[in-house]
Amino acid sequence: MLWWLAYIALGLFTGLFAGMLGIGGGLLMVPTLTMMFAAQAGFPATEVLHLALGTSMAAILFTSLASLRAHHQHQAVLWKVVGQITPGILAGTLIGTLFAGSVPSRPLALFFMVFVCVVAVQMILDLKPKASRELPGAFGVFGVGTCIGALSALVAIGGGSLTVPFLTWCNVRVQHAIGTSAAVGFPIAIGGSLGYIFNGWEHPGLPPWSVGYVYLPALLWLVPSSMLIAPLGARLAHRLPVATLKRLFAAILILLAAKMMWGLSV
């Protein structure tokens, strides 16, 4: 099979939804890449999930830059908050990737599936925290950043599904919460990518063209296609019913999680 075509298709699919809904592609990329890698020769069954996590995180490194730039141009990034939360984010991604590297694929996959289902339910029910407080002090922001970074690294996401609700809860305007979350996604991706590269460095049995747990052939096709289609998704967001799209996206996530569960049971 021409796997590069499958990688391009995945990049287009995730980029389209990322542009329409402002959601990073990690939740779609990880389960799909896991299935793709498992179907190819040369990929050890015990490492396909780690390779999917690392490759997805590396892809987010590039896509988050484009998102950050766009939100900065619209003056939607609170750079003071980014500066306060980044040290905790970096510490958290280090913890998360080290933990992920030491956990076998099965419990890691179960954790990922639970997280995906929680996000899907949140999207279907459109649950949003009520603004009820101000941002915590430096120590509190560091602690929150550490938690966001660790969880984001464990499931290879840019952190938007965690950062935006937190900032909204702290009385940050939605536009600024989304823009700031996009900026926070960059240090998450840096720390997460380096962590997965380090954890998989010289790991025996990984396929050729792997840099740690990052599989370069998939990355090289995923990134351009997802970045190419994302602007179209953003334009479609103003023409299509966003609430319906979110429910469709959530249904796809649940189906992918179910497919991963079925794969673990056979």
Placement of each model-derived feature along the sequence:
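Juxtamembrane transmembrane-helix boundary motif
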Residues: 1-21, 28-50, 64-150, 154, ...
